[in-house]
Curated annotation (Swiss-Prot):
Highest taxon in the source lineage: Eukaryota
Cross-referenced InterPro entries: DEFL
Keyword Transferase: no
Protein name: Defensin-like protein 140
Disulphide bridges, residue numbers: 37-81, 46-65, 51-75, 55-77
Keywords: Antimicrobial, Disulfide bond, Fungicide, Plant defense, Secreted, Signal
Record bears the keyword Nucleotidyltransferase: no
Organism, as annotated: Arabidopsis thaliana
């Protein structure tokens, strides 16, 4: 067996063992109950694209503009969080 082929087989075996180990570890851990949380990212005038980007960046969620009672829009971020 050539050295390069031997190296490739070794790397693939190590990678497979690591992946299988991670899968076994993940199966053994209980899932935490997640709920939907909302957060006002900024209360001033909302631009939808900026709001969606900020929410995805900050909380890995989905952002949108919501009009408040005083007819101003705010950036509302919805994301999954742990139940407290």
């Amino acid at each position: 067996m050539s050295k390069s082929l031997q190296l490739i087989v070794t790397v693939l075996c190590i990678f497979t063992i690591l992946v299988l180990g991670e899968i076994c570890l993940a199966k053994g851990q209980p899932l935490e109950e997640m709920v939907e949380c909302k957060e006002v990212l900024w209360p001033e005038e909302c631009k939808y694209d900026a709001c969606a980007f900020a929410c995805a960046l900050k909380r890995h969620g989905k952002g949108g503009c919501l009009e408040g009672p005083d007819y101003r829009s705010a950036c509302i971020c919805q994301y999954a969080c742990k139940r407290s």
